[in-house]
Amino acid sequence: MKLAKSPRCWLAVAALSSVFASAAPVSSNPPMPANNPAIFYYEGRCDVTSAGDVRWGFPGVTAHLRFRGDALAVKIEAAEDDLYFDVSMDGAPPAILRAGKGVADYPLFKGDKVGEHTIALTRRNESWQGTCTLREFSLGATAGEWLSPPELPKRKLMFIGDSVTCGEMVAYESSRDMRAKLNSNARISYGMLVARRLGAQCHLVSYGGRGIIRDWQGIRDTRNAPQFYELALPDDPAVRWDHSRYVPDAIGIQLGTNDFNQGIPDQNEFINAYVQFVEKVRRDAPQALIFLMDSPIVNDEPGRGPRRAVLHSYLEQIVVRLGSPKVILAPLPRYPGVPNNGHPTGAEHEAMAGELEPLLRRVLGW
């Protein structure tokens, strides 16, 4: 079992079309390995391999970089088809990069002249939708130069959760299949939205379908939150995360949706497991504010019991049990999502961020 090495987590990218759908190499100067911490800053959990590649598995991981040149490309190995990235350059609205299964070079930017650019490359997909490996970045054949990457914010947030925290369905469009991977976009999830509003870094430690004690199907012997929280890559138990690499100022936990999917879980079991998990998180970040959020999906429905009311009651009891001013409840309303899918929409993620922002500003003094 190994600990993940973590260069400062962020890189960069940009584009002129809305979707890069095919791989195409860019003529370049000698490529720069993706693990160079003087050139690339990474935000989010990642693992550096012995070969110097940088692997991502959690949603929202972002690479930040700056360069002077007229072209930029990245070599990516995707474990699955349809891995999507938002490519943001110089503050412009992002373009979308699609990576297909396997190894390929992808153009990120091609300009008419040499210029200085700042780029961010962000993983959109949920955790279960496949790991991606960044191998190297390349400048164009014309004169190019790597510049020091942009400094990351000093403030640090972390959000632990399920598919809601991943940003599932946040980018859904009615013309698109509800199962399409393009519907996910961690960059505009509530956690990353509120982090940008507060001028903070953001780590999303989240996995769709998982809970505190059981997943959405009621399965207990899978990697639920207490297990995947310890990992650099959510589906690789051999790669442990070194919590000293990133110590948040505040940690939001939104869990319970999947625990309650098969019915109301036993009170003592759920509360005890949740308390133990928060205590572990507090040991890793002793000074952090921890705020427990209601599920925006769980609802009181005829035939399914008062699930929302019970979950809220459990959370209240957890806060009392922990007995610390640094552990608080952050109430959230229910959001209906779209017909036939209860995940919050993009507008509803904006609303959740709007609920959390004033609370965090007040409690953190930000």
Regions found by a protein language model. Name each.
Residues 165, 199, 203, 256, ...:
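Sec-exported extracytoplasmic/periplasmic mature domains
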Residues 265-290:
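Glycoside hydrolase catalytic-domain groove-lining segments
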Residues 156-160, 165, 202-206, 249-254, ...:
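Structural recognition of the beta-strand scaffold that forms the well-ordered cores
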Residues 101, 164, 209-211, 297, ...:
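Residue-level detector of flexible, active-site-proximal loop/helix-junction positions
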Residues 147-150, 236-247, 279-285, 362-366:
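Surface-exposed acidic, glycine-flexible loop patches that form ligand/cofactor-binding
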Residues 289-296, 307-341, 346-366:
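Extracellular serine-dependent O-acyl
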Residues 2-4, 10-15, 21-160, 164-186, ...:
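N-terminal secretory targeting modules
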Residues 58-61, 101, 127-132, 170, ...:
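Conserved SGNH/GDSL esterase-like catalytic core that processes O-acyl groups on lipids
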